[in-house]
């Protein structure tokens, strides 16, 4: 893949993971199972590690957890509730273990092992032996006070014998049998309610003369036990919480050394002594071989438990070393969660279709007999490009093995049973416009080169209004398709988006928008979003044009040399080559874009109709290029804003163009080593602020 394609992949994964986070943490309505999420997250991590210059500032890999709901009182945690780093392979467990071999007599205290419960993290406070309050994890720093609801859970102790102030942490979950009973109750209630409704309606039928007015809602079942637990814990009525029989398991005490608890195994024993529910399957392993043995042993029985379990938690047992071992911004370094392999399924291909994207690239999709993967029904999977189909000898009618992996839709990983004698025939023409497809030099993907291809243009418009570009929030791809295909509106070009206000009468006649005041509100929301988007940062507008190789980072660097889009025409090769990440290919792509009369018309239109916001507050750091490594006193996004606001250039990686590398750490990270090798000055956060003061003087 080209850099631009990789960048688009990273943006796509990041946006989708944000969407999943919102559903999972804030709405209690997960769209995918945890294994699918973990695989998506893992693919993003791998891409970021491989292409550090393409890491997004708002990457979900930098965020601890959920946003805080507004349903319950926000409460700050006394100590952050961090998540755990994850391992997927045996080799990653061995690497984790290597970090501790420096300690003498390691086998004497070893590692505690516990199953990873798929529930909702909770922190409960006790004082003088009494239950005081319960707080959800939230974003790791601030959670929700759900004390009244947690108090209804039967196995959560309301009184303990330990009298000192104590904070314990664990998981609230719903047993599998309880979840099944709850869904059965929902079904029975549904039938009972609607039988009565139908009976009453039948009695009135001679008057109504029609069944068309009888409206019966479809019952809403909980897809899995975690959904049921999440929906229950955030109920406004504590009586409902009590009736649904939630359960708990605890595994942590905050500041255990203050309670004279020296090992994690002692913590678990203390919790049990105080009548907290703890997992009975807890082990102590002396070394990496024993860790893997216990992980493999538990995998054989994990489905026999009443709780959902997707992993195994390994903690360095000796607590007084935890602070010394330390933390990242998201994880403790002394613990890790081993995640079990993703579930696979076999199914039969019913059809293979080709789809065209914004750049014209063709993706093949397999449509197959629906199968269940971790409580999710799937019936489509990506086949990537024709080379993948050819290499794996895939055709309609073959039986395949699929896995919910690092894609928004599942992946085909192999042929399970070959039922045909041939391979699927290569698509030669664009599925949208029927143009002959091409394979550019250096690529394996096929491309549609027709600039007027309808689907390409729809995808281009969708990209332009997306969050990382113009962020026109209410103009969905569904709306774009409607306006694009309308005989009068014909929203075919970017300029047409800003002329949509001239077609309000036509929009009101469209069935989707017609009649109701609610639908008129939809129209107003779209138009208001478009007007709001006219005040835009130049870097976002440039990125929204979709020029190959010029994503958000390159656009940000490029806009340091221009004040409007038309200034691009005046930049020399020398100007462009002085920009970090810009090479001959990027220059070629930019020149190709600017050579089009159609694109020049677009540039002129945007310059005349948009108000470019100036993000710079000063020029103190003009022509200085900064990179960052390690943790700082403020978030990386905030630090980046200071650099950009003062005219500096921010880059995710160290290169020959880097002026300073900012780091508070004395450790020799990869970035620090590269900076020193290239005679780039490494400065602390304090030295950076001193530099700002000097420039100001």
From Swiss-Prot:
- EC main class here is ligase
Q: What does this protein do?
A: DNA ligase that catalyzes the formation of phosphodiester linkages between 5'-phosphoryl and 3'-hydroxyl groups in double-stranded DNA using NAD as a coenzyme and as the energy source for the reaction. It is essential for DNA replication and repair of damaged DNA.
Every copy of the BRCT domain together lies at 616-697
Its Gene Ontology cellular component terms are: cytosol
Entry similarity comment: Belongs to the NAD-dependent DNA ligase family. LigA subfamily.
Which Pfam family, an example, fits this chain?
BRCT
This enzyme's EC code(s):
6.5.1.2
Q: Name one GO biological process term.
A: DNA repair
Return the InterPro entries for the record: BRCT_dom (IPR001357), BRCT_dom_sf (IPR036420), DisA/LigA_HHH (IPR041663), DNA_ligase (IPR001679), DNA_ligase_AS (IPR018239), DNAligase_adenylation (IPR013839), DNAligase_N (IPR013840), NA-bd_OB-fold (IPR012340)
GO MF annotation terms: DNA ligase (NAD+) activity; metal ion binding
* Requisite cofactors: Mg(2+); Mn(2+)
Q: Where do the annotations place NAD(+) binding?
A: 34-38, 83-84, 114, 137, 171, 315, 339
Q: Which reaction does it catalyse?
A: NAD(+) + (deoxyribonucleotide)n-3'-hydroxyl + 5'-phospho-(deoxyribonucleotide)m = (deoxyribonucleotide)n+m + AMP + beta-nicotinamide D-nucleotide
Q: What is this protein called?
A: DNA ligase
Q: Cite the entry's keywords alphabetically.
A: DNA damage, DNA repair, DNA replication, Ligase, Magnesium, Manganese, Metal-binding, NAD, Zinc
Q: Where does Zn(2+) bind?
A: 430, 433, 448, 453
The entry's active site is 116 (n6-amp-lysine intermediate)
């Amino acid at each position: 893949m080209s850099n631009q394609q990789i960048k688009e992949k990273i943006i796509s994964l990041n946006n989708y993971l944000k969407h999943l986070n919102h559903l999972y943490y804030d709405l209690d309505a997960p769209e995918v199972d945890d294994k699918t999420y973990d695989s998506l997250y893992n693919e993003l991590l791998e891409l970021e590690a491989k292409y550090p210059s393409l890491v997004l500032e708002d990457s979900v890999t930098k965020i601890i957890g959920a946003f805080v709901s507004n349903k319950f009182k926000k409460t700050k945690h006394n100590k952050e509730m961090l998540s755990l780093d994850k391992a997927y392979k045996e080799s990653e467990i061995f690497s984790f273990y290597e970090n501790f071999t420096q300690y003498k007599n390691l086998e004497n205290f070893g590692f505690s092992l516990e199953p990873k419960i798929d529930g909702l993290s909770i922190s409960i406070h006790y004082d003088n032996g009494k239950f005081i309050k319960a707080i959800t994890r939230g974003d790791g720093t601030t959670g929700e006070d759900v004390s009244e609801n947690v108090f209804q859970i039967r196995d959560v102790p309301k009184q303990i014998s330990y009298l000192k102030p104590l904070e314990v942490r664990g998981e609230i979950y719903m047993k599998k049998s309880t979840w099944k009973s709850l869904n059965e109750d929902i079904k029975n209630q549904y039938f009972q309610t609607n039988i009565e409704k139908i009976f009453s309606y039948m009695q009135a039928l001679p008057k109504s003369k029609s069944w068309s007015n009888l409206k019966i809602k479809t019952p809403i079942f909980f897809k899995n036990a975690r959904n049921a637990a999440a929906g229950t814990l955030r109920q406004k009525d504590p009586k409902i919480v009590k009736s649904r029989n939630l359960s708990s398991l605890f595994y942590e005490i905050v500041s255990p050394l203050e309670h004279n608890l020296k090992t994690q195994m002692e913590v678990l024993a203390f919790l049990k002594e105080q009548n907290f529910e703890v997992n009975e399957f807890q082990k102590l392993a002396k070394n990496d071989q024993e860790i893997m043995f216990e992980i493999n042993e538990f995998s054989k029985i994990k489905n026999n438990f009443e709780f959902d379990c997707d992993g195994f938690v390994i903690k360095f047992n000796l607590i007084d070393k935890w602070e010394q071992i330390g933390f990242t911004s998201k994880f403790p370094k002394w613990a890790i969660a081993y995640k079990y392999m993703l579930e696979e399924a076999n199914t039969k291909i019913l059809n293979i279709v080709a789809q065209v994207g914004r750049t014209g690239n063709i993706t093949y999709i397999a449509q197959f007999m629906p199968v269940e993967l971790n409580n999710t029904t799937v019936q489509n999977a990506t086949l990537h490009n024709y080379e993948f189909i050819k290499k794996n000898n895939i055709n309609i009618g073959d039986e395949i093995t699929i896995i919910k992996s690092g894609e928004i839709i599942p992946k085909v990983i192999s042929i399970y049973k070959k039922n045909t004698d041939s391979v699927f025939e290569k698509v030669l023409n664009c599925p949208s416009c029927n143009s002959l497809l091409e394979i550019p030099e250096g690529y394996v993907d096929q491309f549609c080169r027709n600039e007027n291809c309808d689907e390409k243009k729809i995808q281009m418009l969708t990209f332009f209004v997306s969050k990382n570009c113009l962020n026109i929030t209410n103009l969905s791809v569904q709306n774009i398709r409607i306006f694009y295909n309308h005989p009068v509106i014909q929203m075919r070009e970017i300029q047409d988006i800003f002329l949509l206000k001239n077609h309000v009468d036509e929009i009101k006649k469209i069935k989707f928008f017609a009649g109701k005041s609610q639908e008129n509100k939809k129209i107003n929301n779209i138009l208001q979003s478009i007007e709001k988007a006219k005040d835009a940062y130049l870097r976002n507008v440039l990125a929204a044009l979709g020029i190959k190789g010029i994503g958000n980072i390159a656009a940000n660097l490029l806009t340091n040399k221009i004040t409007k889009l038309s200034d691009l025409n005046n930049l020399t090769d020398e100007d462009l080559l002085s920009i970090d990440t810009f090479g001959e290919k990027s220059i070629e792509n930019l020149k190709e874009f600017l050579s089009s009369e159609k694109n020049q018309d677009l540039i002129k239109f945007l310059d005349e109709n948009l108000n470019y916001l100036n993000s710079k507050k000063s020029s103190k750091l003009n022509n200085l290029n900064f990179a960052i490594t390690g943790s700082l006193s403020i978030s990386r996004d905030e630090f980046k804003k200071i650099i950009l606001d003062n005219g500096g250039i921010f880059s995710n990686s160290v290169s020959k163009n880097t002026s300073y590398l900012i780091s508070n750490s004395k450790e020799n990270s990869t970035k620090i080593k590269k900076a020193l090798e290239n005679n780039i000055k490494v400065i602390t956060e304090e030295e950076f602020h001193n530099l700002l003061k000097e420039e100001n003087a």
